Amino acid sequence: MTGRERLQAILNRQPIDRLSWTTLVDHVTRAGMPAEVRKLSPFDFYRHIGCDILQFGNYGLSAEEAVLSPSRLTCTEMTCELETEKDGKLTRHQIPGANVTFGIGAETVTGRAVLKRKTPWGTLSTTLENDHPVTYPVSSLEDMRILRSIWEASDYVEQDDMEASFARTERLIGDDGMYVPTVDPSPVQSLLEYEMGVENFYYLFADYPEEMKSLLAAMHAKRLKEYEILARRTPAEVVIAVENTSSAMISPDLYRALSLPQIRDYVDVLHAHGKKAVLHMCGHIRELLEPIRETGLDGINAATPPPIGNTSGEDVLDFFGDDFLLFGAVFDPSVLHKADVSSAELQDHLTRLYTPRLRRANLVLWLAVDGLTTPLQRFLAVGQWMKGREGQ
């Protein structure tokens, strides 16, 4: 089987010729590798280590390799200003409001920056550190109303050339794997992660529950259109929603009340267009598995075992059944990233990990190394072990 055939077989719950594994790298991951390896394109690097290519959206790709989105969020009532500081010099420039979603700039920002969304209803300001919010734009009822007005005045507008860029990226991947489009977090998660943060979210929800529900409804109405456009136009068989959900941020009861109905709607849209729905869940999700199951999803990406997470692949199968898709179950980070871990230790862990049940499962093992400098030897050790299990 080729990598593409193997991943397609897993998606369709068909037998495979060998165990499947993948990874996701960026320039930080490869920073300590030999120069000739750092120069490889992401796809050629994946071929070099021998994994199946499961390209997670556009992560790690250059503009020439990336797939264009079939839609973009536009708001004609909003202008965006980005302030960056380098070597003591402040730079301020306008960026199109159409390119700003959830308060994160269209361009990657290294270092500290301030993003201001200016509207007739007021201004929301976000302080970013390496593209992550360190102060949140929404911390009051007034801010919440501004954000709701932005969403009510926004629309997802279809863009040309997605299909052509998808075909180009698929040609670059070839038979070695597949490109899987990703979608931004659902409304609750985007508020928790980017717009409010956990503390502001719960204070505002406690003080102004109806205003919070109104904001979430406005966001959801627009996000449904985004999902419909993507599901209708993408040639991909599966879509991954990047949820990052964790019981450290939301309780099972609140997940069921707020997140579940919205995610179930998104899953229904994908299914209506013949797509499989997979949720990226890299947090602590054991306590959330019951309401997550009620979304009707087909699989989970990035289920993470202890001690970093609290949910192993077998935990997921215990709850969802052995036909469920583990489309990227995380290799134990405490082993993979252990200082001076040997190839023998990694391979011994793999031997213990792959119980007869997991060998039969619809499983892609995922080495989670994005943003983490990782020795080349660790990938090669996993690849060598996997190759030795062909036909098993």
How should each PLM-predicted stretch be described?
Residues 86-102, 121-123, 127-167:
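A gly/proline- and charged-residue-enriched helix-loop-helix capping module
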Residues 33-35, 61, 68, 129-130, ...:
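Short aromatic-enriched loop/helix-cap "lid" or pocket-rim segments at secondary-structure transitions
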Residues 32-90:
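Segments that shape or occlude catalytic/ligand-binding pockets
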Residues 92, 109-118:
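Generic recognition of long tandem-repeat/solenoid scaffolds
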Residues 1-37, 116-118, 127, 145-392:
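Active-site loop segments of alpha/beta catalytic cores
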Residues 15, 47-54, 109-111, 175:
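Short, solvent-exposed loop/edge-beta patches enriched in aromatic
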